[in-house]
Amino acid sequence: HLLKQQDVLSTLSFPVIIKSRYSHRGDLVSKIDNREELDALAPQWRQEPVILQEFSPSDGWDIKLWVIDQQIFAARRRTPLEPGAPKEDFPLTTDELPEDWKSITLEIGKTFNLRLYGVDLLMTDSGPVIVDVNSFPGFRGVQGADDALVRLVERLGEEGKITA
């Protein structure tokens, strides 16, 4: 049985993050502190499918992890919640990542049977929190991703999973 929108909204605990269901590199992300702010934002996003998430205070950085056939690429990006935050990525080497971040990232791929995906996490006072798993993330500007994508396509062709 489906809950009515008002029933769902009445269960919200603020603050929450509201964001587009579709990736826009943080263009459509807002922190909402109360029901009045949510009601005020609704007309602006009327045609946009949205996701509401519990707000997790963080250190101000999003950790972006991209995986192509078990190869991890990583970067830090300023959270889109900070006014005027640059949208550029600051690349990280996998050596800079804690081992548990790498292992959980690869485990996510196994769990969802993904060979190409992205994981976004935040560093909070209580530790890292995964906030997104993207089954088809953008790789623009990710150093080395183009070569890894070519290798994946070649491997899928060899496995007979794609044909010309």
Pin down the residues of each PLM region.
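C-terminal active-site "lid" helix and adjoining low-complexity regulatory extension at the edge
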Residues: E96, K110, M123-A164
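Phosphate-binding site of ATP-dependent enzymes
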Residues: Y22, D27-F112
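Residue-level signal for tight coil/turn positions that link beta-strands
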Residues: S13, D69-Q70, D125
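Conserved protein-kinase catalytic-loop segment immediately C-terminal to the catalytic Asp
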Residues: I17, L122-M123
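Protein kinase-like catalytic core scaffold
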Residues: V16, I51, F73-A74, Y117, ...
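Coil-to-beta-strand transition motifs
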Residues: G60, L114-L116, D125-P128
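A conserved helix-loop-beta module that forms one wall/lid of the active-site cleft
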Residues: H1-L28
